[in-house]
Amino acid sequence: MADNQYYGTGRRKSATARVFAKVGSGDIVINKRSLQDYFSRPTARMVVMQALELVDMTGKLDLYITVAGGGITGQAGAIRHGITRALMQYDESLRPTLRKAGFVTRDARRVERKKVGLHKARKRPQYSKR
């Protein structure tokens, strides 16, 4: 790997993102598509850009991202986590800022399993007193 390339792996729910960052003009390519093409939902685009906007790196790094698994929200969260790790590899002094915003910690919440005798993970059948 080149010296001027920075890498970060991000995970969220069942999604995994691999983020490669290089000093550049601010291009973001996700699975060989642009950010706008890949995420049509504006909230997902906002989540992806949060870490970059926080440390004012929006137009300074080119990002090449591969993401697999999960849905839109999980993939957006995984990309944000991966970007955060790549930024910390690029400049370790950004860590406290990113930590304070909560981007460094992996979101460990997962889907709770459905239990036998229940409709969903916690939804119970209607109770009849008589």
Curated annotation (Swiss-Prot):
One of its GO terms (biological process) is translation. It comes from the Bacteria. Keywords: Ribonucleoprotein, Ribosomal protein. It comes from Tolumonas auensis (strain DSM 9187 / NBRC 110442 / TA 4). Belongs to the universal ribosomal protein uS9 family. One of its GO terms (molecular function) is RNA binding. GO terms for cellular component: cytosolic small ribosomal subunit. This is Small ribosomal subunit protein uS9. InterPro entries: Ribosomal_Su5_D2-typ_SF, Ribosomal_uS9, Ribosomal_uS9_bac/plastid, Ribosomal_uS9_CS, Ribsml_uS5_D2-typ_fold_subgr. The lineage of its organism: Bacteria, Pseudomonadati, Pseudomonadota, Gammaproteobacteria, Aeromonadales.
